[in-house]
Amino acid sequence: MRKIIHIDMDCYFAAVEMRDFPEYRGKPLAVGGSSDRRGVISTCSYEARKFGVRSAMATAYAFKLCPDLILVPGRMQVYKDVSLQIREIFSRYTQLIEPLSLDEAYLDVSECQQYKGSATLIAQAIRRDILAETGLTASAGIAPVKFLAKVASDLNKPNGQYVITPETLPEFVKTLSLRKIPGVGKVTAEKLSSLGLNTCGDVQAYSKPELLARFGKFGGVLIERSQGIDERGISADRERKSVGVETTLAKDIYSLEQCQQVMPGLIQELALRLSRSAKERKIHKQVVKLKFNDFKQTTIEHRSDEVSIVMFYDLLAQAMARQEGRGIRLLGISVGLADSILAVPEIPNAQTQLDLAL
């Protein structure tokens, strides 16, 4: 059995800000774009989350939920520098590290001999080192497989850890919600629920041929995950294929003009996320996605080697041509990343381009 640790920093961007600016501690704090420019929240403190503030939420809506919210702009270079410190701590215990973002990663410690090979003690040591050297807390999940390690890291947040052993795994997955399985979103969960399938235990008892007939290849994945099977290894050289941002709207909107009003905040957040890239990558396409109130979605893409805000607005107009009177529930934009290592993709002269687009 493998020993997989999933490390997830606690409200990372906000935690760095509270570390560097003690006056923010204990207060509802968010890192994100200005509400005046229809920005979105990147992350927020636990104090803000008590009011319902969440990542990817429109900043203006966040202020409605929490009028005393403290909003600060992101300092991406600082977050990158701290992330490198954390990565160095990981490397003391294993070289099998799969970064998922600046603030989370998978580690395979199956061959680590420190602490007599105890993944539980190794995770404790890593979290202790992170706190001592960066002043930040991290949560951890330990399991024999990747997706369960990620599930476990969320169970004792903040500043805690949870262990799923080979012995406890069968009982743990029986009651695990299918929404915790990667690939099971809202629409798929509703389809599964209509069949009486809400937990992994439900899937275990269901007809496997029928699942495969209804869901095809994903049905096979669902059967495996529901038994706690995940053969995916740690991809130490894993590279992201795209960077994007999307927002679920508080209420459905119907016009192109309303969608255009949402775009500036998404563009600001996309610029932040592009600057997080660990490696310098060139883009090869831009994409706009719309999800309608009947849960169907459409995407429009354009091949490009540089980010153009005007092009995002053109793609939005093309996507809206497929609306057919339906309400828009979600709007997203993204860029595809090329394999070549070139310049960090940026969004040049953003406000000028916005003025032109609008």
Curated annotation (Swiss-Prot):
Poorly processive, error-prone DNA polymerase involved in untargeted mutagenesis. Copies undamaged DNA at stalled replication forks, which arise in vivo from mismatched or misaligned primer ends. These misaligned primers can be extended by PolIV. Exhibits no 3'-5' exonuclease (proofreading) activity. May be involved in translesional synthesis, in conjunction with the beta clamp from PolIII. It is found in: Cytoplasm. Binds 2 magnesium ions per subunit. PROSITE patterns: UMUC (PS50173). Residues 4-185 form the UmuC domain. Pfam families: IMS, IMS_C, IMS_HHH_1. InterPro entries: DNA/RNA_pol_sf (IPR043502), DNA_pol_Y-fam_lit_finger_sf (IPR036775), DNA_pol_Y-fam_little_finger (IPR017961), DNA_polymerase-Y (IPR050116), DNApol_IV (IPR022880), IMS_HHH_1 (IPR053848), Rev_trsase/Diguanyl_cyclase (IPR043128), UmuC (IPR001126). The active site is at E104. It comes from the Bacteria. It catalyses: DNA(n) + a 2'-deoxyribonucleoside 5'-triphosphate = DNA(n+1) + diphosphate. GO terms for molecular function: damaged DNA binding; DNA-directed DNA polymerase activity; magnesium ion binding. Monomer. Belongs to the DNA polymerase type-Y family. It comes from Shewanella baltica (strain OS185). The record marks F13 as: Substrate discrimination. One of its GO terms (cellular component) is cytosol. Keywords: Cytoplasm, DNA damage, DNA repair, DNA replication, DNA-binding, DNA-directed DNA polymerase, Magnesium, Metal-binding, Mutator protein, Nucleotidyltransferase, Transferase. One of its GO terms (biological process) is error-prone translesion synthesis. Mg(2+) binds at D8, D103. The keyword rRNA processing does not apply. Its main location: cytoplasm. This is DNA polymerase IV. The lineage of its organism: Bacteria, Pseudomonadati, Pseudomonadota, Gammaproteobacteria, Alteromonadales. Its EC number is 2.7.7.7.
